[in-house]
Swiss-Prot record:
It comes from Pyrococcus furiosus (strain ATCC 43587 / DSM 3638 / JCM 8422 / Vc1). One of its GO terms (biological process) is glycyl-tRNA aminoacylation. Belongs to the class-II aminoacyl-tRNA synthetase family. One of its GO terms (cellular component) is cytoplasm. It is found in: Cytoplasm. This is Glycine--tRNA ligase.
Length: 568
């Protein structure tokens, strides 16, 4: 019988304290998972690796609320566009995600199709309810954000955040001041996000509450060469670009430098952070041959993205699973928040030398329009002052073409306006920064780290070959038998290792063979065994989880040796 890694891992996670479905005693709730003692430890280690990598890049961390006022998500586009297609059974009332139902029934990809198009496909192929066989409704869109209210008033609508990013964008003015108005700079946040998935399945792969680590890198769109790209240019990336997906050409492997030169990746700024993502996943313990970058098709991309590459990890059960997104969000978010809030979210870019530029200057001809516009003059003047150079150029073009324009509801002719082209010396310009966003999920890499670590030896031993510094229990101290003086010596070693900062357990129950199996199964890289030789010469054995080989070490050298073995 073939070993079912998924089923074994699900059992292992529940049985040994890694993770399990939430609210078990009340029948559970799909899309929610609890982390047990071992799982929570690994999850924290993943977060620590990501946090340390971000800090090494010079990014700084903030923390913002999970509950966010509705205005923020109106501005960000989530109220309008953060939706999935939904369909309901007219007979039993069961609801399903329409695109998934069509794909599972017909094997066709309907990503990007409208609700009307999906309804037509359902009707043409007579797709029925998977639960009861009943007729399905027309497809409509369901917003994935959890809705709530701030305080006792229904007019203070809010949402649980679907991403941590907006908390960074709305704080841009303060963050830019903290960064001393100097681009580029990065800000990250690690925290919970919430998406009210229609039908979450696949265990920990699709959750309604999950943890993200997102960094927003603010940069000048005219400066897209990363200053440290030379340090990473030779790193090999496995890519699956759009062209290769459409033509079924498979993946390609090439260096970061080649990826930019051949046009697969837009610039060295983008490529640099692809390498950063890959290195973080390797540091967590994901095997290199299980990592690839897939470029999202245009219809897959989020409403804010101009280009997105997903770092995917391979799963025996689920295939390639998206775990990290690298999205070019352009100036979408900051521009939207500027418009909605009225706040100035620009950055002043100072030139090395002053520039002479030609500018359009459009004002009202007061002699001509003053008598007829009267109190409206101020309003129209303010509108003209607020217009960008591009808007003024369009206004003049329209005036030349039609002989008139409408401003603030008032029709104005050529003679009503004074149009001049003036030269101006400028020291710099205000820009809305663009954003590149590496966005890590934590829960999916957690599960896929366990799946890719689960190993079966030739003799049938099942153990977790997790990267040693990612193990939830780093050391087990075991007396060979539960007798003095072995137990006292073992316990003293255990206490000393605790003080040295190891995650360590003491265990004297069952035979030594059973205990080795117990700790192999949860990935403990080393067992320190106090045996009958220990009282005679002050040495113990350190057993390696993967090879099962043992070395003898003096008790006083155990902490140093374990640090060397586990952390390098």
């Amino acid at each position: 019988m073939k070993f079912d890694k998924y089923e074994y891992l699900q059992d292992l996670m529940r049985r040994r304290g890694f993770a399990w479905g939430s609210f078990e005693i009340y029948g559970g709730a799909r899309g929610f998972y609890d982390y047990g003692p071992l799982g929570a430890t690994i999850k924290r280690k993943i977060e620590k690796k990501i946090r340390e990598a971000f800090i090494r890049e010079g990014f700084f961390e903030i923390e913002t609320p999970d509950i966010t006022p509705e205005q923020v998500f109106i501005a960000s586009g989530h109220v309008e566009k953060f939706v999935d297609p939904l369909v309901e059974c007219k007979k039993c009332g069961a609801r399903f995600r329409a695109d998934h139902l069509i794909e599972e029934t017909l094997g066709i990809d309907v990503e990007g199709k409208s609700a009307e198009e999906m309804t037509k496909i359902i009707r043409e192929h007579n797709i029925r309810c998977p639960e009861c066989g009943g007729e399905l409704s027309d497809v409509w869109y369901f917003n994935l954000m959890f809705e709530t209210y701030i305080g006792p008033y229904k007019d203070k609508k809010a949402y649980l955040r679907p991403e941590t990013a907006q908390g960074i964008f709305v704080n841009f003015k303060r963050l830019n001041a903290f960064a001393r108005n100097k681009l580029p700079f990065g800000v990250f946040q690690i925290g919970k996000a919430y998406r009210n998935e229609i039908s979450p399945r696949q265990g920990m792969i699709r959750l309604r509450e999950f943890t993200q680590a997102e960094v927003e890198i603010f940069f000048n769109p005219n400066e897209t060469e990363h200053p440290h790209f030379d340090e990473v240019k030779d790193e090999v990336l496995r890519l699956y670009p759009i062209e290769h997906q459409l033509k079924d050409l498979g993946m390609i492997e090439l260096t970061a430098e080649e990826a930019v030169k051949k046009g697969y990746v837009m610039n060295t700024f983008f490529a640099y952070y692809m390498v950063m993502i890959k290195r973080i996943l390797l540091d967590i313990g994901i095997p290199e041959d299980k990592i690839r970058f897939r470029q999202q098709l245009p219809e897959e991309r989020a409403h804010y993205s101009a280009d997105t590459w997903d770092a995917e990890i391979y799963s025996e059960r689920f295939g390639w699973v998206e775990c990290v997104g690298l999205a070019y969000r352009t100036d979408y978010d900051l521009s939207r928040h500027m418009k909605m809030s009225g706040a100035d979210l620009t950055v002043m870019i100072h030139y090395d030398k002053p520039k002479i530029v030609k500018k359009l200057n459009v004002t009202l001809n007061m002699k001509k329009v003053g008598p007829k516009l009267k109190e409206k003059v101020k309003e129209i003047n303010e509108k003209l002052k607020s217009m960008s150079q591009e808007e003024l150029r369009k206004l003049v073009e329209e005036l030349n073409a039609n002989g008139k324009v409408i401003i603030e509801g008032h029709e104005l002719e050529k003679e009503d306006l004074i149009i001049k082209e003036v030269e101006e010396k400028i020291q710099g310009e205000k820009i809305v920064p663009h954003v590149l966003e590496p966005s890590f999920g934590i829960d999916r890499p957690f599960y896929l780290l366990l799946e890719n670590s689960l190993t079966v030896d030739e003799d049938g031993r099942v153990y977790l070959k997790i990267k040693k510094d990612m193990a939830p229990i780093e050391v087990a101290v075991l007396p060979l038998v539960a007798k003095e003086p072995l137990t006292t010596i073992a316990y003293e070693i255990y206490r000393n290792l605790q003080k040295e900062g190891f995650i360590v357990v003491y265990d004297e129950k069952d035979s030594i063979g059973k205990r080795y199996m117990r700790y192999d199964e949860i990935g403990t890289p080393y067992c320190v065994t106090v045996d009958n030789q220990t009282p005679e010469d002050g040495t113990v054995t350190i057993r390696d989880r993967d090879t099962r080989e043992q070395i003898r070490v003096k008790i006083e050298e155990v902490p140093r040796k374990l640090k060397e073995l586990i952390f390098g």
